[in-house]
Every structure is written in structure tokens, then in C-alpha cells.
Curated annotation (Swiss-Prot):
UniProt similarity note: Belongs to the sigma-70 factor family. RpoD/SigA subfamily.
Species in which this protein is naturally found: Xylella fastidiosa (strain 9a5c)
Name of the protein in question: RNA polymerase sigma factor RpoD
Keyword Isomerase recorded: no
Chain residue ranges for the region called Sigma-70 factor domain-2: 383-453
Name of the gene this protein is made from: rpoD
Length: 618
């Protein structure tokens, strides 16, 4: 590849040198020196623009001598600068190469991915610590928000009622991480051994939440929840007595937050707490926006005046009166909407009471949370981008299984992002070791869910994979395909279930699949159409019709016509006794007698023998 690019640069250098010497180039000459795979008109225009920028004109055909003489002042004194030509050739070559590489989305993705440097073990730990710090700042902000404590206590109550698993509420303790690390480090497990186990179980497909998680000690959780509940009750009591800004209230609120941050909350619960705070902040901002609209758009109060006077007065119900007393030109209009503004302020006061915080505190808590989230998100992004190559290397092993390579990469990236969220650097393993499990889990699950035209449940995919693996082993062992009985014995499963699994495991095949060496016929041509009558049935029906007509010919014309009408032979439909009686102008009873007599004649062996062979014995 390097030699090819060097040769390309040499050709372009000669082209530029030629253009500098003669002062012009033709489109044909430029086209001859461009790569064959460069077909994008925009890229070609950019290249010609760069050539024009060097003072070389590009023409459809070579200009005549008179035109060259007219331009002699511009071209005759031009010197050929080899260095400039080399630099220009390198730039154009790079542009060409870039253009050729941007047509394939996989190449584009890999080129962009390759610009990010790989992380060392120390780099992984540094990013993991930044993620941890950001999440800690988020939880610290949530801890100061009283409704977060209320929600945590209510979720724990649901756990006590059996409606929540403990790990759906609390997954550990932040202040015991160091102790957990010391315990983990004493276990003699290496990254390689984990990877080996993963390789052996490559065909298994499980739930994304099947990752082994060791829950916290229930007794310890109960003890800490009890302490949190006690402190929170004390906070509510003091708040009701003194309000949000009293020193004792602030002190107890900090004590509640100190206990709150010791819990390592589950990701769904953390998201719920964050959403709760964001909704509250949005409500506060919504009321302020309405007041801003009323004051500036309706009353025409200058925006600067509003902002200056509104600050620290969001819940001051006297603010409107004070603004009106300033006797500005907008004061009368402000008086007309006084009740509306006061209503919005009262709603903000109600929010303060509901949250046990001032509006300023709510905004500050939100600012802390947003800052922590941004810090964690930035670090997660860096960790993900630095490990995209790992996803590529794993996804390559799962090609030709029903999903496109880009789809495999996408699913693997989703698993990588989950791994980043759940990674704990203190356990001593490299991130790549931990992420491999999540990436494979995401890819294998997506293959199980999406690869087949007819979806098969994931648990059945596991059984099919196990069956295929054992079948291959027995084929190598015995030199033949294993029978269902042998597979049932090997897998310790009922034989009928093995047969069902083998039937389900069949892959769909296209009806356009060529058949034979000439490939002039397709599989669909040999599939029986159940809606079309077979030739045997057609022949049988024709013979039956002829035989019935012959038998009826042996009866009297009246008897034959009665039977034809009663059974619809050679007619559109059959007829009732009354309908046949009207046709012959006789009673129903007479028609019944004629019919019975005719059938007795047909049952005679001389006539019935001809029809008996058509009876379907089966």
C-alpha cells in the first residue's frame, strides 16, 4: 500500500511539474494521473481547484500558440520548485486516498476509530476514577434533595413487602469499596482464566442482567436504612418548626445526605432519582418563564429591569406591588396581571414546601448534579472510544451468522457501553477482560433475536447451540451423524424433545435456490402446491363422472332425472323433494318413492360393482 501511494505521488509530481513548465494542463492529462476509483465529481473539482491555486490553468484542449503568447507574462518567468511540487503531490495524493476510502462506511468507521489511542492499565484506572467521581458528585447532589431520601425509603419498603429485590434498590456500599477490594485481591484469579471460561461457553446466550452480582448484606442495609429514616424524620420535624434556612435544619439535612451517599444505588433507581430532580427543576423554571412572559411580553416591562428586580424575589409576594409603585410606563399593565404573577409565585412557594428546600437550593443541587453527570459522561465516552477496537475483534468471530458486520459492531458497542457503566476498577481486572463478556453477551443475544427469519426464543437457541456442539463432537467420534436416541442419551433429554429441537433448528431456504448443474430450475418448481388438484385425483374424478352417467343411463329417464336433481349431478346444485316435485308436478312423497326405487336399482350388484371401486377405503 505504501509503494502504491509513493508511485501515485510520483505521477502527480510529474503532472504538476509539467503544468508549471508549460503553464497549463488539459483535463485529459489530469484524469490520466488520478486514481481509477476516484469518481466523486466534488472531489475532482477540489483537486482541479488546488491545481488552479498553483497558477496552473486547466483547459478542455491545449491552448493555441497565440493564447500562450498573450499569457507569456504570467507563464514565461515561472520557475519549477521541486519542493512545492512534492508538497502539492503529497496533498493531492492524500486527498485522492481520502476520497477513495470514504465510500465504504466500514472503512470510514474504522478510520475514525483508529484516531483514538489505546489505553494503558493506568489510563483505564484514571478514566474509571473520573467516572466514579462524577457519579459520586451526582449522588452527593441527590443526597441533599429530601425527596430522593423519601423515594429510597419507599423503594426499600417495597422490598420488605416482597415487591422488589434488594439489588433493585441497593447494590452495595460506597464506604466499603476498599474492604471489598482487599477481599477480591486475595482471590487468585487471572484475566486469562476468565477469558478461557468465556471462550468455552461461547455459544451460550443469556439475559443481559445475568451478570453475576453479589448483593449487599441485608442486615447491614436494614441497619443503615433505619439510621437514614431516623435522621430524615428528625429533619422533617425541624423543618416544620424552623423552615429551610435554620442552622439546625441545614445540619440535620447534611447528616441525612452523609448517610444517603454511603449507599451504592442500582442504576435504575439512580436514573429515577435524577429524573425526579429534573422534573422538579423544570417545574420551577416553568413558573419563572411564565412570570417572565407576563412581565416582559404582556406588561412590556424591560427585560433588564425584570431580571435585576426579580433576582432573589421569586417567592416574594410583594414584588409586584413594589414594581407597580415605581410608577413606570408599564406599571398600569403590570397591575392588570398582578393576580396571574402572584399565582405563579404562590405555585413556587408550594414547590419549596413540597421539597423542603428553597428555590435557590433546588437550582444549586441541580447544577451540582448536571456537572457530575457531564463529568461522568465525558469519561465514559473516552472509555468507550478507546475500546472500539475490542468490539471489532470480537464481532469478527460472529460473521456469517445472519447479521451484517455493521449490525454486529453496533450491538457490540451497546454491550461495551453497559460494561463501562458497570466496570469496577478496584476489583483488579483489566477493563478489556470485563468488557469482553458484555460485548459477547450483546452480540450473541442480538443474533438469537434478529438473525433468523422466524424468531426462536433465546432459551431454545441455547439448546440448539448445545445440540449442534454435541452433534459435531459425536460426528468426529463415530464418523457419522448421531441419531436422536444417541443425542437424547448424551444430553440427558427426552427423545421427543430432541426431535422437536432438531425440527426447530432447520434454517429457512430460499425458493429461488438453483437446482442442478445447469441452474435453469429452482427449488420452488419442485414444491407441491396443495391448492392444485393432483393429476391422479383429476383422472379419478373424470372416470367417476363417466361411470355415474353410464349407471344412470340404465334407469328410466324419470328416475335418472330425479337422482340428478336430488344429488346435483351435472347441475349447479342439488334440489329438495319439494323442488323436484314442482318440476314433475307431483307430491314430495311421490318423488321420495321414485328416489328410493332408483337407489334400490343402483344397489343391485350388476350396477353397484362399477361404482364400488371408487370408494375411498382409507
Amino acid at each position: 500500500m505504501s509503494n502504491e501511494r509513493t508511485a501515485q505521488q510520483s505521477d502527480i509530481k510529474q503532472l504538476i511539474s509539467k503544468g508549471l513548465e508549460q503553464g497549463y494542463l488539459t483535463y485529459a492529462e489530469v484524469n490520466d494521473h488520478l486514481p481509477e476509483d476516484l469518481v466523486d465529481p466534488d472531489q475532482i473539482e477540489d483537486i482541479i481547484g488546488m491545481i488552479n491555486g498553483m497558477g496552473i490553468e486547466v483547459h478542455e484542449v491545449a491552448p493555441d500558440a497565440e493564447t500562450l503568447l498573450l499569457n507569456e507574462g504570467n507563464t514565461g518567468n515561472r520557475e519549477v520548485d521541486d519542493t512545492a511540487a512534492e508538497e502539492a503531490a503529497a496533498a493531492l495524493s492524500a486527498l485522492d486516498t481520502e476520497a477513495g476510502r470514504t465510500t465504504d462506511p466500514v472503512r470510514m468507521y474504522m478510520r475514525e476509530m483508529g484516531t483514538v489511542e489505546l489505553l494503558t492499565r493506568e489510563g483505564e484506572i484514571a478514566i474509571a476514577k473520573r467516572i466514579e467521581e462524577g457519579l459520586s458528585e451526582v449522588q452527593a447532589a441527590l443526597g441533599v434533595f429530601p425527596l430522593s431520601t423519601e423515594l429510597l425509603l419507599s423503594e426499600y419498603e417495597l422490598h420488605k413487602e416482597g415487591k422488589r429485590r434488594l439489588t433493585e434498590v441497593v447494590v452495595g456500599f460506597n464506604d466499603l469499596i476498599e474492604e471489598d477490594n482487599s477481599v477480591t485481591s486475595s482471590v487468585d484469579v487471572t484475566d486469562e482464566s476468565i477469558v478461557e471460561v468465556d471462550e468455552e461457553d461461547d455459544d451460550s446466550v443469556g439475559n443481559d442482567e445475568d451478570a453475576p452480582t453479589i448483593g449487599p448484606d441485608p442486615a447491614e442495609v436494614a441497619s443503615r436504612i433505619e439510621s437514614l429514616s431516623t435522621e430524615y424524620a428528625k429533619f422533617k420535624k425541624l423543618y416544620a418548626k424552623h423552615g429551610p434556612e435554620h442552622k439546625a435544619v441545614i445540619k440535620v439535612r447534611e447528616d441525612v445526605a452523609a448517610i444517603f451517599v454511603t449507599f451504592k444505588l442500582s442504576l435504575p433507581l439512580t436514573d429515577l432519582l435524577v429524573q425526579q430532580l429534573q422534573n422538579m427543576v423544570n417545574s420551577v423554571k416553568d413558573h419563572e418563564r411564565k412570570v417572565l412572559h407576563l412581565a416582559t411580553n404582556v406588561a412590556k416591562m424591560p427585560r433588564k429591569d425584570f431580571i435585576r428586580s426579580w433576582e432573589n424575589n421569586q417567592t416574594n409576594l410583594e414584588w409586584v406591588e413594589d414594581a407597580i409603585k415605581r410608577k413606570q410606563k408599564w406599571s398600569s399593565a403590570l397591575r392588570d396581571i398582578k393576580d396571574q404573577i402572584t399565582a405563579e409565585q404562590q405555585a413556587s412557594i408550594d414547590l419549596e414546601k413540597a421539597n423542603s428546600l428553597t428555590l435557590a437550593d433546588i437550582k444549586e443541587i441541580n447544577r451540582m448534579m448536571v456537572y457530575g453527570e457531564a463529568k461522568a459522561s465525558k469519561a465514559k465516552k473516552e472509555m468507550v472510544e478507546a475500546n472500539l477496537r475490542l468490539v471489532i475483534s470480537i464481532a469478527k468471530k460472529y460473521t456469517n451468522r445472519g447479521l451484517q458486520f455493521l449490525d454486529l459492531i453496533q450491538e457490540g458497542n451497546i454491550g461495551l457501553m453497559k460494561a463501562v457503566c458497570k466496570f469496577e476498577h478496584r476489583r483488579g481486572f483489566k477493563f478489556s477482560t470485563y468488557a469482553t463478556w458484555w460485548i459477547r453477551q450483546a452480540i450473541t443475544r442480538s443474533i438469537a433475536d434478529q438473525a433468523r427469519t422466524i424468531r426462536i426464543p433465546v432459551h431454545m437457541i441455547e439448546t440448539i447451540n448445545k445440540l449442534n456442539r454435541i452433534s459435531r463432537q459425536m460426528l468426529q467420534q463415530f464418523g457419522r451423524e448421531a441419531t436422536p436416541e444417541e443425542l437424547a442419551k448424551e444430553m440427558d433429554m427426552p427423545e421427543d424433545k430432541i426431535r422437536k429441537v432438531m425440527k426447530i433448528a432447520k434454517e429457512p431456504i430460499s425458493m429461488e435456490t438453483p437446482i442442478g448443474d445447469d441452474e435453469d430450475s429452482h427449488l420452488g418448481d419442485f414444491i407441491e402446491d396443495p391448492n392444485v388438484e393432483s393429476p391422479v385425483d383429476t383422472t379419478t374424478n373424470v372416470n367417476l363422472s363417466e361411470t355415474v352417467r353410464e349407471v344412470l343411463a340404465g334407469l328410466t329417464p324419470r328416475e335418472a332425472k330425479v337422482l340428478r336433481m336430488r344429488f346435483g349431478i351435472d347441475m349447479n346444485t342439488d334440489h329438495t323433494l319439494e323442488e323436484v316435485g314442482k318440476q314433475f308436478d307431483v307430491t314430495r312423497e311421490r318423488i321420495r318413492q321414485i328416489e328410493a326405487k332408483a337407489l334400490r336399482k343402483l344397489r343391485h350388484p350388476s350396477r353397484s360393482e362399477q361404482l364400488r371401486s371408487f370408494l375411498d377405503i382409507d
